[in-house]
Amino acid sequence: MAHQEYFVVVYNNGTKFWFQNGKLHRLDGPAVEYANGDKLWYQNNKRHRLDGPAIEYADGGKHWYIDGVKLSIDILMALS
């Protein structure tokens, strides 16, 4: 795999955003990590994750997205 270069914005409270070519994007982890523990995966500015939920809230809530499209529980159950 080619080396990935990111522009990372880190706020004083610890919140972090990863960008590539001006878009939220990260291949090796969440592109957004909020100080409260929430994590959001993005590729090319779209919520996207194939190996788990694209949104993981610190309180345990989770949402699955592929290429920016939210997957319903029915689709998730059919895929498992």
Where are these regions (language model features)?
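Glycine/tyrosine- and acidic-biased, solvent-exposed loop/turn segments at the edges of beta-strands
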Residues: 1-80
